[in-house]
From Swiss-Prot:
Keywords: DNA-binding, Nucleus, Transcription, Transcription regulation
DNA-binding region: 26-119
Organism: Oryza sativa subsp. japonica
A Gene Ontology term for the protein's cellular component: nucleus
Annotated protein name in UniProt: Putative B3 domain-containing protein Os03g0619850
Cross-referenced InterPro entries: B3_DNA-bd, DNA-bd_pseudobarrel_sf, REM16-like
Domain of life: Eukaryota
Subcellular location per the Swiss-Prot or TrEMBL entry: Nucleus
GO MF annotation: an example: DNA binding
Residues covered by region (Disordered): 126-150, 230-253
Comp. bias intervals (Basic and acidic residues): 230-239
Length: 253
């Protein structure tokens, strides 16, 4: 308990110095991450009142590396909550329970977010990459034999793939003979609706750029691999997609 209290004091002291640096010109609020806030986050009422008790339907969060994320704001039990897009922001920055997030209102519906580790230190490693594509790794076929199309592997999946799984993926990619890059991800609970959050799958910035996904919300058709080459209504499913600047979120309809 003593160690936890010490870390909290360091975190608060760091935030206090930052707020003093702002000279009271900007509105800020501090959130300490809990298990619940990893999936959705409640904005403090006092901060919401700064906006006349109402925050627009979407806001932009500027991460430490300068990338903007669009997050949906909803009302739940008289509370203002960040939901769709929030979990993707948390995952992209490897935010953990016990970390502290300092939100600074920049302009309109845009907020700068400072991420502090559980010991109260700013996570400076997040500032090193400003191109927004390190969350994914692009793999290609082995140098032996004819080169095949590349596939883009979710950063969450890369560390969990065995050598056999990687071999199977390469063989599958080669057999598909796609003219565009293929996206590969390991399914988890949030992808198949086993959590309290909406079912969704994040498609990263590199894949979105590689296949020219539009920067707007729209419906698309997903077709199972067995149905490739012909259209089968029973094997097609329409999904609603919400595009955000550096990620694509696939959300169950």
């Amino acid at each position: 308990m003593a160690g936890g209290g010490s870390r909290m004091k360091k975190s608060c002291a760091c935030c206090k110095r930052y707020l003093e640096h702002l000279g009271g010109k900007m509105s800020c609020f501090l959130i300490r991450m809990t298990t619940d806030s990893m999936h959705s986050m409640i904005i403090p009422d006092r901060f919401v009142n700064h906006f006349g008790g109402k925050i627009p339907g979407t806001i932009k969060l500027e991460s430490p590396n300068g990338i903007l994320y669009v997050v949906e704001v909803t009302e739940c039990m008289n509370k203002t909550v960040l939901q769709c897009g929030w979990e993707a922001f948390v995952d992209a920055h490897h935010i953990k329970v016990g970390d502290s997030l300092l939100f600074r209102h920049i302009e309109n519906s845009c907020f700068e977010v400072m991420i502090l580790d559980s010991d109260g230190s700013e996570n400076v490693s997040l500032k090193s990459n400003r191109n927004g594509v390190s969350d994914e790794s692009q793999e290609s076929e082995d140098s032996e034999g004819p080169a095949g199309p590349p596939y883009i592997l979710s950063w969450k999946s890369k560390s969990r793939l065995s050598s056999l799984q990687k071999k199977i993926i390469k063989e599958k990619v080669r057999s598909i003979q796609s003219e565009v890059p293929i996206y590969v991800a390991i399914m988890n609970k949030s992808n198949i609706g086993l959590t309290s959050s909406p079912c969704q799958l994040e498609l990263g910035a590199r894949y979105a750029a590689a296949v020219h996904l539009p920067d707007r919300r729209q419906a698309v058709v997903l077709q199972r691999g067995a149905a490739m080459g012909h259209r089968d209504a029973d094997q097609e499913r329409q999904m609603h997609h919400q595009a955000v600047p550096d990620q694509w979120l696939e959300q169950d309809s």
